[in-house]
Amino acid sequence: MKGLSGSRSHHHGITCEAACDSLSHHSDHKPYLLSPVDHHPADHPYYTQRNSFQAECVGPFSDPLASSTFPRRHYTSQQELKDESALVPRTLATKANRLPTNLLDQFERQLPLSRDGYHTLQYKRTAVEHRSDSPGRIRHLVHSVQKLFTKSHSLEGPSKGSVNGGKASPDESQTLRYGKRSKSKERRSESKARSNASNASPTSPSWWSSDDNLDGDMCLYHTPSGVMTMGRCPDRSASQYFMEAYNTISEQAVKASRSNNDIKCSTCANLPVTLDAPLLKKSAWSSTLTVSRAREVYQKASVNMDQAMVKSEACQQERSCQYLQVPQDEWSGYTPRGKDDEIPCRRMRSGSYIKAMGDEDSGDSDTSPKPSPKVAARRESYLKATQPSLTELTTLKISNEHSPKLQIRSHSYLRAVSEVSINRSLDSLDPAGLLTSPKFRSRNESYMRAMSTISQVSEMEVNGQFESVCESVFSELESQAVEALDLPLPGCFRMRSHSYVRAIEKGCSQDDECVSLRSSSPPRTTTTVRTIQSSTGVIKLSSAVEVSSCITTYKKTPPPVPPRTTTKPFISITAQSSTESAQDAYMDGQGQRGDMISQSGLSNSTESLDSMKALTAAIEAANAQIHGPASQHMGSNAAAVTTTTTIATVTTEDRKKDFKKNRCLSIGIQVDDAEEPEKMAESKTSNKFQSVGVQVEEEKCFRRFTRSNSVTTAVQADLDFHDNLENSLESIEDNSCPGPMARQFSRDASTSTVSIQGSGNHYHACAADDDFDTDFDPSILPPPDPWIDSITEDPLEAVQRSVCHRDGHWFLKLLQAERDRMEGWCKLMEREERENNLPEDILGKIRTAVGSAQLLMAQKFYQFRELCEENLNPNAHPRPTSQDLAGFWDMLQLSIENISMKFDELHQLKANNWKQMDPLDKKERRAPPPVPKKPAKGPAPLIRERSLESSQRQEARKRLMAAKRAASVRQNSATESAESIEIYIPEAQTRL
């Protein structure tokens, strides 16, 4: 009798009628055709032991609300009372069992609409159901249901599905079919007739009736079902469903139930039930039934235990729990809104362990009364798999001290996972293999959810998972229904897309070992790259389950001293993505990362290799292998990736020492965040939620970038060279204003945001060998310092300075550094002009230099600032690229050099105590004969100065041409570079 409906779920009590011996008096009753005028007086033998409710229970039978049959439920205006006992005469049930189906239909059609007499067990559904069970009670109910389900099916297994444990006689095959609620025409027509009769009165609350309590031999033995609720009491939701069964129990009922192996119900007999009784809590119950006795009751052949009690108990949960989303037509045999369509008698069959076998063709069909041999074999293997759990559960005493978490621990989550080889042979059972195998995402998670959700629901108050448990316990082979309820649990069983894990293992399997070796600098902490699976299941019925899934790197932010790099890797990760990548691109909070480390080998149900995963994996691998991710800390927010870059104030000597030994290539995924130059020396986390893209973030910004043709925005990579760094650091040491100059070398993490658009994008982060002289980063060098005589620049330095491929942030910082330097010069010269009594020619030079600098800052610097802001504005049209900014900056350098030369001359004059020329030099100039040489006296130094200035300009032009050549060579050789990180992301990556 697997077909008990949901509304019948509220009676689990031991039969409380004292007149158990009076059953023989009514064995001669015709079970269906009693007179409608039988008013069931108070001295009726079935109602001899009523309580104080009895006077209110009896009502006129013309009233449809009161015209229920035995056992009935009466509803008063003050409080709705439940007057049910599951006691049905065994002889009467046996007679009803043997009646043919067509005769049952005739009996039902002959009945009036008042449906009086002993026709069937009728239960009234309230119009507005108050579903107020607490989650703790729900967990308790679910745990009870799970154990009943496990035991009943373990008894079914050896007898090939017979509910009577091997005693299924030919007589009872019809009962078996009825218990299964098969899709036969008789049952459907009968249910339809019942539905039409039940819903004839639209004003009254809907009635439903079922003959299933009269179907089998076990109707007398509904009592174990009430006992094996394991100490539950009908608390809050049962305020309108007080059970007479508990307060009218007598010694005879206890004796009758002790024939079922001494089930003790002492506390049930003392339970006070009155109209004003307070709601009973679980602490008021102390059932002395142990699970071992429950198993004996189940295994006793006279009990004839089958699925009806599992159904009756679990359907109470379905009735009282408002979270169940399973359609009522699938659960109960009635239509709640009185529609005339056919009542679906098919249940969601309770063999979800067959679902767990992953068998698509599912050898057990609804219409077949006997399961196939395949299903029988599966049930036997299921019995083997679950027997250790049952054995351990026999020692567990269920009382008010045991919480559901404690009760379920004995067949724990791991055992449920490891014993789920139901459609596979037991010898091939390997829990690790099951967990890591992509084939594991078959239907065996249905059973595993049934075993594991109960243990996990106490940790997670996700009421939707209760729905998954009920579906798993009571559904048989409903592929569509189970798939609709296919909720991913934190166990993360599905292993569909592990290619990113394999790619990481192939591409950077050495990283975790090599990082600690390469990070050999004493200040650095050991940096490890971990792949962390974060998942939060958003439970949505009959829709796609959204699961946040990502790979983040979990590491500490180290000091900025770069480690020593021995080799440069070639990392190429090609990630074929599925179309589900949009919902995976979000990351969970950082709080989950610590406890999710244990699941790092698992993936979610909607796991796919989207761009975030592949790019993060490859880029973090590159970080770890090239220099360790010294400059960034990958965090995760709800919709963005944040990067913390540590820019510490390191002395120039330390930098010079480190940069001579190292080349630091750091690539990261980050978001836009503008940082002021004053804060460049401190760690700062960028928290703006903008479009997340792939781009290269350089630790000390001694790099250069390249852009692939297929990428819409620049994906940048850097190179730095120690010889070039030496020169730049020497110039910094000799610089008179080392503060803003040193600031140019400390680049923060806020590089531009690069969106991933289109499919088939290639991102190249390229590096070159040391002998590739044309690939130098120009922006690492300070602006030209012609006022310092000790600096002599070679063409390579010119190339390095000229080529610049930065974004707007970087050029704004350079521009600010130049402005600060020039303003410092202007203030210095103006102060010298005020403090010293200088000759007019020197004053003229000072005013010329200061005016030129101010004009340059007011005009060209302002124009360049606007260009940088347009570059940072994604809506600007036309939007200057980084290469445009680099070219404009190179032209700006020429003007900066001219002004620098003027200030250099002023510095020389100041060093000479503001004296114009050395007298010795003047004497040498006057040495030629006076008459022919007089016209050339004055302009001679001027001509020499102009020639020097023109030579400087020619050198600057040469540097600019060399820079352009280097840029073209670098772009052509980007893909043929000696070291590259290539990430190929095809398909479905346009939704970031």
Swiss-Prot record:
Protein's recorded name: Disks large-associated protein 1
Gene, per the UniProt record: Dlgap1
Region (Disordered): 150-209, 355-376, 914-980
Transmembrane domains' residue ranges: none
Keyword Membrane: yes
Annotated organism of origin: Mus musculus
GO biological process, one term: chemical synaptic transmission
Biased amino acid composition, Basic and acidic residues: 918-927, 943-958
Compositional bias ranges of the Polar residues kind: 969-978
Free-text description of this protein's post-translational modifications in UniProt: Ubiquitinated by TRIM3; leading to proteasomal degradation.
Similarity remark: Belongs to the SAPAP family.
